[in-house]
From Swiss-Prot:
It comes from the Archaea. InterPro entries: RNAP_P/RPABC4, RPABC4/Spt4, Rpo12. Part of the RNA polymerase complex. It is found in: Cytoplasm. One of its GO terms (molecular function) is zinc ion binding. Its cofactor is Zn(2+). HAMAP family: RNApol_arch_Rpo12 (MF_00615). Binds 1 zinc ion. DNA-dependent RNA polymerase (RNAP) catalyzes the transcription of DNA into RNA using the four ribonucleoside triphosphates as substrates. This is DNA-directed RNA polymerase subunit Rpo12. It catalyses: RNA(n) + a ribonucleoside 5'-triphosphate = RNA(n+1) + diphosphate.
Length: 49
C-alpha cells in the first residue's frame, strides 16, 4: 500500500491517495486533476562553495 499526501491546486485541501489501488489522480472534493506534493516546512541550508 503506497499512500501519498497531495494538495489540490484548485481548492487547497490535502488529499491522501493510495496509488496502488487507483491511478486516477483527482481531488475527491472538487474533481480537479492538478495535484502537487507540498514541500516540508523545514528550511534547507546549502553550504556555499
Amino acid at each position: 500500500m503506497v499512500e501519498a499526501v497531495y494538495r489540490c491546486f484548485k481548492c487547497g485541501r490535502e488529499v491522501k491517495l493510495d496509488l496502488s489501488i487507483t491511478r486516477d489522480l483527482r481531488c475527491p472534493y472538487c474533481g480537479s486533476k492538478i495535484l502537487y506534493k507540498p514541500r516540508p516546512k523545514v528550511p534547507r541550508r546549502v553550504k556555499a562553495i
